[in-house]
Amino acid sequence: MSSVCDVCGKGPGFGMSVSHSHRRTRRRWNPNIQTVRTVVGGTPKRLNVCASCIKAGKVSRA
């Protein structure tokens, strides 16, 4: 499944996981992507939308 929002384009953030002994390994923080049925151009369509776009009302559910 895609980890990019179809509305705002938000994608994963990258960084390091740091243990107590300060060993560092690469990791990624994925946005909270939900599959939402919405009306685009008069036809219902499934979009991958982040939770912040759903909360902000940028997407109307079908």
From Swiss-Prot:
GO molecular function: structural constituent of ribosome
Biological process terms in GO annotation: translation
Entry keyword set: Ribonucleoprotein, Ribosomal protein
Highest taxon, organism lineage: Bacteria
Keyword Thylakoid found: no
Cellular compartments per GO CC: ribonucleoprotein complex; ribosome
Pfam families: Ribosomal_L28
Coiled coil region boundaries: none
Gene3D superfamilies registered for this protein in UniProt: Ribosomal protein L28/L24
InterPro entries the record matches: Bacterial_rp_bL28, Ribosomal_bL28, Ribosomal_bL28/bL31-like_sf, Ribosomal_bL28_bact-type, Ribosomal_bL28_sf
Transferase recorded as keyword: no
NCBIfam families: L28
Family that this chain belongs to: Belongs to the bacterial ribosomal protein bL28 family.
Identification of the protein by name: Large ribosomal subunit protein bL28
Organism from which the protein derives: Frankia casuarinae (strain DSM 45818 / CECT 9043 / HFP020203 / CcI3)
Lineage: Bacteria, Bacillati, Actinomycetota, Actinomycetes, Frankiales
